[in-house]
C-alpha cells in the first residue's frame, strides 16, 4: 500500500500513487500523488482538510487612484522603495481577485486591519460580473435546506462532501440577506416578495436574480461598498505572479505575493499576514469559454507551485448553452469569450431542438431540459457529433413576449444586435467551458495546507460541487466561504507580525525590457500561437467526452508543447526570473492543463463532468475526491515558483 503525505500533514493511505511526467524527459517521476481509492472514512473531506490540514492561525463606481502612501482610519499604510527602485507594500490582508468572494471577504476583514485588493484588470472584470442566472438559496416556505442539499448532491453525482453541502445550504439565506442590506437589488414579484426562478437540477424555485444580469448587480453593490471603505485599497491592473512562501520545518507559510503592473510593467511586492486567493477559474485552457479573459488559472497555478494541495481538477463544467455565433443572422467578429445563455432560459420553459426542430432532451433524460448541466452538455455534444452539426437551438419564443424581455433583457439585446429576435426565433447554442469544480483544496473555513493562505470562490475546491456543479450554487459558495474565512483570518493576523525585512527574503522578478522590442515581440507572438495550440489540444482530447488514449495523447502533446515554448523563450534570452503578463498567463495555463489531464487519467469511471468511453459507468469504489499532493520535484519553468532555485 502506497502512502501519500501532504506537506506538513499526517499520512493518508492510498491504494496506488499516480504520477505526473517530467516535462523535461520521458522518465516519469513522482511529481504528485493523486488519491482516488481507499475507504470513504479514511478521507472524509471536511474533517481531513479542517483538522489534518488546519493552519495555525450596471455602472460601476470609479476606482480610487492608489498612490505611494495612503491614510486610513488605522494609520499609514507602509510602502517602501528598495535601492534598486522596486516597491514593496505592506498590509494586514492581501486579497487576490475582485469578484464576489474577494470583495465580500475584504469588506469584513477591513474591520480589523488594512486590506489590499489586487485585481488583474479593472475591478469589475471578474467572472461574477458575467454571471447571469442568480444565487440559489432556500427563501420560500415550500422549500427546505434538505431539498437544496439533495439537489446539490444528486447534481454532484454523489461526490459532494455532505457537511460542506449542509453548511452552504444552511448559511446561504443569511448571506443573501446581507447582500440585500448592502444595497444589491434583486427582482421582486407583484406580491412584493423576491421573484425566485428555477433552473436545471433544482426541485424548487430558489434562484434569486436581477433579470439576467445578477452578477453585474452584485458586483456593483460590492464595489460601491469597497470604494467607500478607507481600509480597503484596490490595485487594478496588477497581475499576480507567484505567492511568496517559506518553509518552516514541515510547514509552508505564505507571506504575500509578487505582482506586475500590466501597464507600467513595474514589479510590486505585497507582504501581508494573510492572503486570500479569490482569483476565479481556468476557462481559457479551452478555445471557447464563457469566462472573462482574466480567467487563466492564475490562482490555481500559483497555489500548486506554492505546494498547496489541489483536488478534483478533472471536473471541468461545460455550460450547455453558450451563444453559437455562426448560427446568428449577422455573425459577429471574433469574441474573446463566449456569450452565455443562462440556465434560467431552460428553467423558464426553453426547449432544445436540433436543426430539424426535433426535440431531443427527453431521449437522454427524463428531466429533459431541466437535467443537470453535465447531462445536457453531453446530450448536445452527442447530437452534434451524430448529425454533423455545429450547434443546436434553444427556443423560448412560445412564452409571452413581455415575460421573455423582462426576464432576459441582456440576452435579448445581444441577440437582436446580431439580427435575431428571441421572442420569435430560436437561439443557436453550443457548449463552452464554463466552470472549474476542482481547485485548491479548502476546509470549512477556507483554510489550505499553506499557513496564512485562504481560498474562496471558483479557485477553491470545498467539496460542495462534487463531480458537477448545480446551477447557481457558485455565487452562493463564494458568499458562504468568503464569510467563513474571515474569523480564522483575523485570528491568524492577531498572532502574526509583519517583518519589514521580509521583502529581501526572495529574489525579485524582473520585467524583460533588456531583451529589446524586437525579441520581446517575437516572444509574445510565439506565446500567443502556443496558447491557441494548447487550447486546441484541450478541446480535441480533454473535452466533454474523453478516453484514456486521447488523454494520453493530450498529456504527451502538452508536455512537448510546453518544452518547445520554454526552450524558445530561453533561447531568446529569457531568464527564469523574468515576468511578462502573456508569458506568466501561459505558464499558468500549462500548469492547469497538466493538472486537468493527470486528474482525468487517474479516475477510472465516468462520474458527473468526467465521462470516459473506457470506463462508461459509475464505480462505487471510485467515489472519492481526486487529490494532488505537492511535490518539490518540478522541473519546468511553468511548475516552479520564480523565486525557487534556478532551473538546472
Swiss-Prot record:
It comes from the Eukaryota. SUPFAM superfamilies: FAD/NAD(P)-binding domain, Succinate dehydrogenase/fumarate reductase flavoprotein C-terminal domain, Succinate dehydrogenase/fumarate reductase flavoprotein, catalytic domain. It holds the Pfam family FAD_binding_2. This is L-aspartate oxidase 2-b, chloroplastic. PANTHER family: L-ASPARTATE OXIDASE, L-ASPARTATE OXIDASE, CHLOROPLASTIC. It catalyses: L-aspartate + O2 = iminosuccinate + H2O2. FAD binds at residues 98-101, 120, 127-134, 298, 458, 474-475. It is found in: Plastid, Chloroplast. GO terms for biological process: alkaloid metabolic process; NAD biosynthetic process; nicotine biosynthetic process. Its main location: plastid.
Amino acid at each position: 500500500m502506497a502512502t501519500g503525505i501532504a506537506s506538513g500533514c499526517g499520512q493518508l493511505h492510498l491504494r496506488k500513487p499516480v504520477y505526473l511526467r517530467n516535462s523535461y524527459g520521458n522518465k516519469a517521476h513522482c511529481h504528485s500523488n493523486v488519491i482516488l481509492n481507499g475507504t470513504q472514512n479514511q478521507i472524509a473531506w471536511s474533517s481531513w482538510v479542517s483538522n489534518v490540514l488546519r493552519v495555525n492561525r450596471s455602472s460601476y463606481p470609479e476606482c480610487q487612484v492608489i498612490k505611494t502612501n495612503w491614510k486610513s482610519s488605522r494609520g499609514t499604510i507602509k510602502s517602501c522603495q528598495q535601492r534598486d527602485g522596486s516597491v514593496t507594500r505592506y498590509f494586514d490582508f492581501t486579497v487576490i481577485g475582485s469578484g464576489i468572494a474577494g470583495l465580500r471577504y475584504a469588506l469584513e476583514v477591513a474591520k480589523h486591519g488594512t486590506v489590499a485588493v489586487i485585481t488583474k484588470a479593472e475591478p469589475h472584470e471578474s467572472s461574477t460580473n458575467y454571471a447571469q442566472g442568480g444565487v440559489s438559496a432556500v427563501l420560500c416556505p415550500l422549500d427546505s435546506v434538505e431539498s437544496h442539499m439533495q439537489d446539490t448532491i444528486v447534481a454532484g453525482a454523489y461526490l459532494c462532501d455532505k457537511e460542506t453541502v449542509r453548511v452552504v445550504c444552511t448559511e446561504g439565506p443569511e448571506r443573501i440577506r446581507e447582500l440585500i442590506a448592502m444595497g444589491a437589488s434583486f427582482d421582486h414579484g407583484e406580491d412584493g416578495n423576491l421573484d425566485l426562478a428555477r433552473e436545471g437540477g433544482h426541485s424548487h424555485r430558489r434562484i434569486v436574480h436581477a433579470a439576467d444580469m445578477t452578477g453585474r448587480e452584485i458586483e456593483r453593490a460590492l464595489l460601491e461598498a469597497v470604494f467607500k471603505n478607507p481600509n480597503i485599497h484596490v490595485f487594478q491592473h496588477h497581475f499576480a505572479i507567484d505567492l511568496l512562501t517559506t518553509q518552516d520545518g514541515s510547514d509552508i507559510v505564505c507571506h504575500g505575493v509578487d505582482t506586475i503592473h500590466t501597464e507600467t510593467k513595474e514589479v510590486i511586492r505585497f507582504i501581508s499576514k494573510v492572503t486570500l486567493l479569490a482569483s476565479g477559474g481556468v476557462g481559457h485552457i479551452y478555445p471557447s469559454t464563457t469566462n472573462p479573459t482574466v480567467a487563466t488559472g492564475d490562482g490555481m497555478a500559483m497555489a500548486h507551485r506554492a505546494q498547496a494541495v489541489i483536488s478534483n481538477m478533472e471536473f471541468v463544467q461545460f455550460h450547455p448553452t453558450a451563444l453559437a455565433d455562426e448560427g446568428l443572422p449577422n455573425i459577429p467578429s471574433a469574441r474573446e469569450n463566449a456569450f452565455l445563455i443562462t440556465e434560467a432560459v431552460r428553467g423558464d420553459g426553453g426547449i432544445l431542438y436540433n436543426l430539424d426542430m426535433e426535440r431531443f432532451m427527453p431521449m437522454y433524460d427524463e428531466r429533459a431540459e431541466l437535467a443537470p448541466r453535465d447531462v445536457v452538455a453531453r446530450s448536445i455534444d452527442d447530437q452534434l457529433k451524430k448529425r454533423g452539426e455545429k450547434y443546436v437551438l434553444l427556443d423560448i419564443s412560445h412564452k409571452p413576449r413581455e415575460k421573455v424581455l423582462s426576464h432576459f433583457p441582456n440576452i435579448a439585446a445581444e441577440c437582436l444586435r446580431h439580427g435575431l429576435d428571441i421572442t420569435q426565433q430560436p437561439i443557436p447554442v453550443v457548449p463552452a467551458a464554463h466552470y472549474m469544480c476542482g481547485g485548491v483544496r479548502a476546509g470549512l473555513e477556507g483554510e489550505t495546507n499553506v499557513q496564512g493562505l485562504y481560498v474562496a470562490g471558483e479557485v477553491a475546491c470545498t467539496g460542495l460541487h462534487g463531480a458537477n456543479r448545480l446551477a447557481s450554487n457558485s455565487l452562493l459558495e463564494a458568499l458562504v466561504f468568503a464569510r467563513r474565512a474571515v474569523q480564522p483570518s483575523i485570528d491568524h493576523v492577531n498572532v502574526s507580525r509583519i517583518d519589514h525585512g521580509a521583502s529581501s527574503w526572495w529574489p525579485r522578478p524582473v520585467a524583460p525590457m533588456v531583451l529589446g522590442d524586437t525579441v520581446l515581440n517575437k516572444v509574445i507572438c510565439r506565446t500567443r500561437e502556443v496558447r491557441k495550440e494548447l487550447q486546441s489540444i484541450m478541446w480535441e482530447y480533454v473535452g466533454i467526452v474523453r478516453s484514456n488514449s486521447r488523454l494520453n495523447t493530450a498529456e504527451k502533446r502538452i508536455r512537448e508543447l510546453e518544452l518547445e515554448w520554454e526552450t524558445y523563450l530561453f533561447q531568446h534570452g529569457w531568464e527564469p526570473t523574468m515576468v511578462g503578463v502573456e508569458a506568466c498567463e501561459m505558464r499558468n495555463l500549462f500548469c492547469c492543463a497538466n493538472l486537468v489531464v493527470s486528474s482525468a487519467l487517474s479516475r477510472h469511471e465516468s462520474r458527473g463532468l468526467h465521462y470516459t468511453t473506457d470506463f462508461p459507468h459509475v464505480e462505487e469504489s471510485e467515489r472519492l475526491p481526486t487529490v494532488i499532493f505537492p511535490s518539490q520535484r518540478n522541473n519546468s519553468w511553468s511548475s516552479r515558483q520564480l523565486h525557487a532555485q534556478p532551473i538546472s
